[in-house]
Amino acid sequence: MSVDSIYERLQSCLAAQRVAESGAAVEPTARWPFDRTISYIARTHFDEWNLTVEDIHETAIENLVKRSEEMAANVAQDEEGRISLVVLSQRDGYDASRLLLPTLHERLSEHLASPFIAAIPHRDILLCFRNDAETVQRLSPQVAEDYRRMPHQVTEQLMIVTPDGVAPYVG
């Protein structure tokens, strides 16, 4: 199979790290959908296609952005009427991966303030919420429970989302 034939289907995803080489909670990878199945790209393909990890990542992110242009989100408000939680759950297998969207901070910080917290306990949900002690304490146990209980686990580690990117939350 040539790289041209899969380029438009290449999607970025976050998967649980199976081999803890870097100590990171999650690692970005790429995959492409074939009707009802998904195939992960092996590093050997990079050499065959004469592509770098950066080439694959850039294309996968571009495709994820296109796939995510029009999405519905569920929100919860606090007692003052401020949005305190945004839930992205399209159930397309890429919800956790949307943490990688380049405009995520820009789009959600107007509602959640900056920086905000994100959680990706499993593949089919991205939770973004205010970075305040009460909200973090309230939602952390549910994130941990979802991680233990749901299939396609990613991580129970909370992430902090800033204008500069995403990092593990140490709170």
Describe the role of every protein-language-model region.
Residues 112, 122-171:
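C-terminal structured domains
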Residues 71, 107-115:
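Short amphipathic beta-strand starts and helix->beta connectors
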Residues 75-77, 117-121:
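Short beta-strand
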Residues 82-84, 119-123:
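Short acidic (Asp/Glu) and glycine-rich catalytic loops that position anionic groups and cofactors
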Residues 60, 64, 68, 104-108, ...:
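Hydrophobic, Leu/Ile/Phe/Ala-enriched alpha-helical segments that form helix-helix packing faces
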Residues 95-109:
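Short amphipathic alpha-helix segments
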Residues 1-93:
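Charged, alpha-helical interface segments at or near domain boundaries
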